[in-house]
From Swiss-Prot:
It comes from Homo sapiens. Involved in bone homeostasis. Acts as a negative regulator of RANKL-induced osteoclast precursor differentiation from bone marrow precursors. SMART domains: LRR_SD22, LRR_TYP, LRRCT. Residues 163-214, 350-402 form the LRRCT domain. Its main location: secreted. InterPro entries: Cys-rich_flank_reg_C, Leu-rich_rpt, Leu-rich_rpt_typical-subtyp, LRR_dom_sf, LRR_TM_domain-containing. Residues 1-18 form the signal peptide. This is Leucine-rich repeat-containing protein 17. Residues 225-268 form the LRRNT domain. One of its GO terms (cellular component) is extracellular space.
C-alpha cells in the first residue's frame, strides 16, 4: 500500500512540474516568433530605404535606370555607366551642374520632367554626344542658351513646355536654334511667360530680333500723339498706276513707278507681276493674298530689308521669285513655307549676314532641293565675306569635335553648280524671248 501511495505522489509531482514548465515554453515560443517576425518584416523597409540603388533593368537589349519619385537632388555615384536610358522624373533636382552626366557616354534618352530645375549650367550635358531625347518639361526654367546643347549634336527630341520662359535677349540664341527647319521636334509648344507683351507666344514663332531691338519695340508700341490733330492718312497705292498686258501672259508691269508699297487691287488673274526698281523696303503680311494665279514675281532692286513671315501667304502657284539687289540679311522663320511649287529663287546682290539667322534660308533650300537658287554669299561679318553660305555653315559645325558633329548633307557648296545653272538659264531665257519677239513680229 505504501508503495502505491509513493507512486501516486510521484506522478502528481511530475504533472505539477510539467504544468509549471509549459507557460514558460509558450512564452519563449511566442518571443521567438516575434523576433523571427521582426527580422522578416525588416526586409521591405530596407528595400525602400533612401540611398539604396534605383531599379536597373534591360528591355529589348537596352539598359534602363528607373529612379522616378525618389526625392533625388543629384545623380548618385553608384549608377552603371553603360546606361542607355535614364528616368529621373518627379524628383527634387533644382540645378543641372557641369559634367553631371559626363560618365554616361552611351546615354540615348534622359527624362528630367517634373523636377524643380531652374538652372542649367553651360556644360551640364557634356559627354552626351549620343543623346537623342531630352525631356525638360514641367520645370522652373526661365532662361536658357543654345550653348547648353553644343554637346548633344544628335539631339532630335527636346521638350521644354510648361516652363516659365522669360522671353528677352537672354534666350535669343535658343529661339534661333529652335527655329531652324531641321529642328522641327525641338521645343514644340513651349511658350513665353513674361514679359507681358510676349506672354503665350510660342518660342518657335517669336521673332528673335525683336527681343533685343528697342527701335522695333517702339514701332510695335508707338507713343501717343501729343498734338490734337488727327493722323495724316496717306492714300493707298492703286494698281492703275501700272501697265496691264494680256499677251503672251497676263502681266502687271509696275516697274520704276516709285512705289513704296505693294499696290492694292491687283487683278486676281495676273500670272506675272513686275515690281522691280521701286522703293518697297518691306513686305507686310498677306501682300499677295488675292493673287492666287501668280507664277512669276519680280521684287528686285527695291531695297527690301524685311519680309514678314506671312508676306507670301496664298502664293501656292508661284514658280519664280526674284529678290536680287535688295538689302536682305536673312529670312525670318516661315517666310518661304507657302511656296510649295517654287522652282527659281534669285538671291544675288543682297548683304547676306552669316550668323545663326541665315540657317533657316539655307536649310529650307537644302530640304527643297528642286528649287534652283543663286547668289547666297556672305557679305558680313568681315571674317566670312566672300564665303558661300554653305561654306560658312560647314565651318560653324567644324568648330566642334568631329565625333560630335550631327549628320548633315555631305555637299554644302553649290556655287559652281549654281553659276553653271544661272548661265544656262539666262541663255535659255534669252532664246525663248527672241522666239516670242520673232512670232510677234
Amino acid at each position: 500500500m505504501r508503495v502505491v501511495t509513493i507512486v501516486i505522489l510521484l506522478c502528481f509531482c511530475k504533472a505539477a512540474e510539467l504544468r509549471k514548465a509549459s507557460p514558460g515554453s509558450v512564452r519563449s515560443r511566442v518571443n521567438h516568433g516575434r523576433a523571427g517576425g521582426g527580422r522578416r518584416g525588416s526586409n521591405p523597409v530596407k528595400r525602400y530605404a533612401p540611398g539604396l540603388p534605383c531599379d536597373v533593368y534591360t528591355y529589348l537589349h537596352e539598359k534602363y535606370l528607373d529612379c522616378q519619385e525618389r526625392k533625388l537632388v543629384y545623380v548618385l555615384p553608384g549608377w552603371p555607366q553603360d546606361l542607355l536610358h535614364m528616368l529621373l522624373a518627379r524628383n527634387k533636382i533644382r540645378t543641372l551642374k557641369n559634367n553631371m552626366f559626363s560618365k554616361f557616354k552611351k546615354l540615348k534618352s534622359l527624362d528630367l520632367q517634373q523636377n524643380e530645375i531652374s538652372k542649367i549650367e553651360s556644360e551640364a550635358f557634356f559627354g552626351l554626344n549620343k543623346l537623342t531625347t531630352l525631356l525638360l518639361q514641367h520645370n522652373q526654367i526661365k532662361v536658357l542658351t543654345e550653348e547648353v546643347f553644343i554637346y548633344t549634336p544628335l539631339l532630335s527630341y527636346l521638350r521644354l513646355y510648361d516652363n516659365p520662359w522669360h522671353c528677352t535677349c537672354e534666350i535669343e540664341t535658343l529661339i534661333s536654334m529652335l527655329q531652324i527647319p531641321r529642328n522641327r521636334n525641338l521645343g514644340n509648344y513651349a511658350k513665353c511667360e513674361s514679359p507681358q507683351e510676349q506672354k503665350n507666344k510660342k518660342l518657335r514663332q517669336i521673332k528673335s530680333e525683336q527681343l533685343c531691338n528697342e527701335e522695333e519695340k517702339e514701332q510695335l508700341d508707338p507713343k501717343p500723339q501729343v498734338s490734337g490733330r488727327p493722323p495724316v492718312i496717306k492714300p493707298e497705292v492703286d494698281s492703275t498706276f501700272c501697265h496691264n498686258y494680256v499677251f503672251p501672259i497676263q502681266t502687271l508691269d509696275c516697274k520704276r513707278k516709285e512705289l513704296k508699297k505693294v499696290p492694292n487691287n491687283i487683278p486676281p488673274d495676273i500670272v506675272k507681276l513686275d515690281l522691280s526698281y521701286n522703293k518697297i523696303n518691306q513686305l507686310r503680311p498677306k501682300e499677295f493674298e488675292d493673287v492666287h494665279e501668280l507664277k512669276k514675281l519680280n521684287l528686285s532692286s527695291n531695297g527690301i530689308e524685311f519680309i514678314d513671315p506671312a508676306a507670301f501667304l496664298g502664293l501656292t502657284h508661284l514658280e519664280e521669285l526674284d529678290l536680287s539687289n535688295n538689302s536682305l540679311q536673312n529670312f525670318d522663320y516661315g517666310v518661304l513655307e507657302d511656296l510649295y511649287f517654287l522652282k527659281l529663287l534669285w538671291l544675288r546682290d543682297n548683304p547676306w549676314r552669316c550668323d545663326y539667322n541665315i540657317h533657316y534660308l539655307y536649310y529650307w533650300l537644302k530640304h527643297h532641293y528642286n528649287v534652283h537658287f543663286n547668289g547666297l554669299e556672305c557679305k558680313t561679318p568681315e571674317e566670312y565675306k566672300g564665303w558661300s553660305v554653305g561654306k560658312y555653315i560647314r565651318s560653324y559645325y567644324e568648330e566642334c569635335p568631329k565625333d560630335k558633329l550631327p549628320a548633315y548633307p555631305e555637299s554644302f557648296d553649290q556655287d559652281t553648280e549654281d553659276d553653271e545653272w544661272e548661265k544656262k538659264h539666262r541663255d535659255h531665257t534669252a532664246k525663248k524671248q527672241s522666239v516670242i519677239i520673232t512670232i510677234v513680229g
